[in-house]
Amino acid sequence: VLTSDSQALPLAQKVQAQLAGATGLADRGVKMADFAVLRQTDMPAILVEVGFISNPREEQLLKEETFLDKAAVAIAQAIAAHLNHPWKN
């Protein structure tokens, strides 16, 4: 998970932790990045990289619907927790 804004750091940390826990992938931590997609926003922003196609195992996982569902739910749960919004399945 990447961010360029210290205000977005708590959200980025929640998403990273939830994503690593749900998917079983390595927790690569949150990194600061000066990307336009993060920098040119009017609100705190994060960029989530669920996996990398340069990694054969992750490439295969990115093709699996169950893995993508786990990742999507993990991201949504982290955002809901960050907003103090109860999560409903």
Model-identified regions with their sequence ranges:
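Active-site-proximal helix/loop segments of hydrolytic enzymes
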Residues: 1-89
